[in-house]
Amino acid sequence: MKVKKLSGKVQDAQQIPTLFDNENITYHPINIVNWKEYPYQPQVSFRIAYTNDAILVHYKVVEDSVRAKYGEDNGSVWTDSCVEFFSIPAGDGIYYNLECNCIATILLAAGSERNLSLIHI
């Protein structure tokens, strides 16, 4: 997959879908279930681009039902209906984990793959 670089800055996350539409950034499906014990598979796709100072990701999710229990950042959002983004952008072994539930509560952590520390937002 080739990730497109966009010029300029995004001032508000709500601008991302329109910006991606205008730049013809396409959706990519996520159609793999990694855990046998959790066979449920919602319909998920994403599109991604970057700027000089940001990685921009837009998810589209269709589920049978949703859960949104956690409203405080760095809470247990992974137990809610959520999406995740993992990256090692500098190739230095520092692994970033970003999780967001369906009410925009964020969990952000960084570190080695087995030793993540929360980043206060």
Sequence positions of predicted segments:
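Conserved small/polar residues in nucleotide/adenosyl-binding loops
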Residues: 119-121
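Surface-exposed, glycine/proline- and aromatic-rich loop segments on solvent-exposed faces
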Residues: 27, 33-112
